[in-house]
Each structure stands twice: as C-alpha cells, then as structure tokens.
C-alpha cells in the first residue's frame, strides 16, 4: 500500500518580487542648497549704538573686541553681516538670542 500524504506539497506563497531598477535616463540631482550651512545675518538698524552691538557680539559669540568691532562696522557700513553659521537649530537659537538683545537678525542658507 502506498503512503498517501494528507498535506499539499510546499508551495511558496510569496510570489517573487520583480527586480526594479531605475531607467538609465533617470538622473538623481542633489539639491545643493540642502548641503549649505545656515547663517545668522545681523541687519543695520537706527536704534542700537555701535558699542552696544560690539558688546552683544562679544557676549553671545565669544568674539574678541577686534573681531566684534569688525563685524559691527560691516553691519554699519554694508547694512548687514554674517555673525554665525551652523546647523539650522544652532542658527535659530542665535537669532533668538540676538532678538532678545534687541538686534535685527535673520537666518538663511549660506550663499557662498
């Protein structure tokens, strides 16, 4: 007497997934803007005195008096200066601190 199996033979229930490859004409472009760091820009204003702006740059960013004065003069003469750079979170925090000190500041991606 032959042995009868009551179970069906093993069948792979999962169909083989098709191999998906990108077409040769597809080119993935990297958004270079996403690779650039963020910068904090301080803008000239008619309210804050130059020595106060210099003091704030020293206090918030640890700049020497000479470097803080140089940045302050750039704000005064060119209308703006980049005073810090880094991650978005860091720059957002720097902008908040500058606003708390009464300075006009914004953030943007580094343009260089």
Swiss-Prot record:
Family matches, as Pfam families: ClpS
Gene3D superfamilies per UniProt: 3.30.1390.10
Superkingdom field: Bacteria
Gene Ontology BP term (one): proteolysis
Purpose of the protein: Involved in the modulation of the specificity of the ClpAP-mediated ATP-dependent protein degradation.
Record note on quaternary structure: Binds to the N-terminal domain of the chaperone ClpA.
Protein family membership: Belongs to the ClpS family.
Listed name of the protein: ATP-dependent Clp protease adapter protein ClpS
